[in-house]
Amino acid sequence: MREKLNQHLETFIGKELFDIHLVCEMMCFEFGDMALHAQSFTRILRNDEVLVTTLDYQGWDEIDDKNNDEWYNMNQFKHLIIGNKIERIELSPINDLFIYLDNGVVIQSFAANGPLHWGYCNEQWRLLIGSDDLEEESIQIVAEGKNLEYFDKV
């Protein structure tokens, strides 16, 4: 499984980050016919400075949920993030995912589950590969805690 995943990760090299969408504490990164949906703790760095994190969503004005730090920070820094190409992509032994862009931006998505005894593994991130309709006809690689699941094209 890990070898197959690494082959698919290699196909991300050179892809341009076209857009980012925020959904509560989830970040969705679009790379043309490929995407990353990050549901675990995710942060975006540039030159060793944190630009935005999924936890920033929790800092809000308590009146309008659109007034939160995640969306504010993304609006401030989006021009530094999108439009750049992937130079390198790494997967740690515990399924932390690191994407390095050609302008010094790093996208980090961390596996957030420890050993589970009573709960279940939550989806950490999902890679969608190879289709314009990414939800329907794509190869999907899903990290759930320490487990990786691979789904071939539907």
Regions found by a protein language model. Give the residues of each.
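Surface-exposed, interaction-prone regions used to assemble/regulate multi-protein complexes
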Residues: 1-154
